[in-house]
Amino acid sequence: IPLRFQVTEFDCGTVSLLNAFSYLFEREEIPALLVKSIFKYTLDCYDDKGNLGQGGTSREAIKKLTKWITNYTSENNFNVKCTRLEKEQVTLEKMKECINNNGVVFIRCYQECEHYVIITKITKNYVYIFDPYYLERNEYDNDNSVKMILNKPFDYNRRVTIERVFSETKKDFSLGSVYSR
């Protein structure tokens, strides 16, 4: 099935996690308990008015969910491995290794604020991302580092330079400072 877009301003983490599993598995292979747990752990942050979920998904929630998935896969017949990387552990080589082993990379990057997306392909110069935030086709016309891809709904919808992804800026799709990764 095609990968999905966010239904709110805040559910990029939830949707990107669901997209990661949708990319890796057929619908009938995805356990309902996994989907339920993604919804349980994500959207755990409050906005400045105290509204739960409207602050998105925290790093701590992703850490806990990674642990839950690891435990679940060790106790059940579900073949997936989650490895959580931080700071200087986040390297292009590790991302390529994941992709080359038929995996998906779930990252927290920037898009005006912290934002979650998945990487499904890496080439010599580019990272191919599925961004769950729907944008108009001309959004990146003035940004040479990002290209909208509209004809790959099962795989990706952005092509981003590797240089941009690993820049220590807060430009769209940058991972930002090494120490905040």
Set out the residue ranges of the language-model regions.
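Short Gly/Pro-enriched loop/turn and capping motifs at secondary-structure junctions
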Residues: 31-35, 114, 134-136
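Cysteine-nucleophile protease catalytic domains, especially the papain-like/related folds used
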Residues: 1-85
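Generic alpha-helical hydrophobic packing signal
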Residues: 31-35, 119, 151
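Noncatalytic regulatory segments and standalone regulatory/sensor domains
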Residues: 99-101, 121-181
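Active-site-adjacent substructure of cysteine-protease-like catalytic cores
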Residues: 81-134
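A generic structural signal for ordered secondary structure
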Residues: 65-73, 116, 137-139, 143, ...
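Alpha-helix N-cap/loop-to-helix boundary motif
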Residues: 50-57, 87, 111, 160, ...
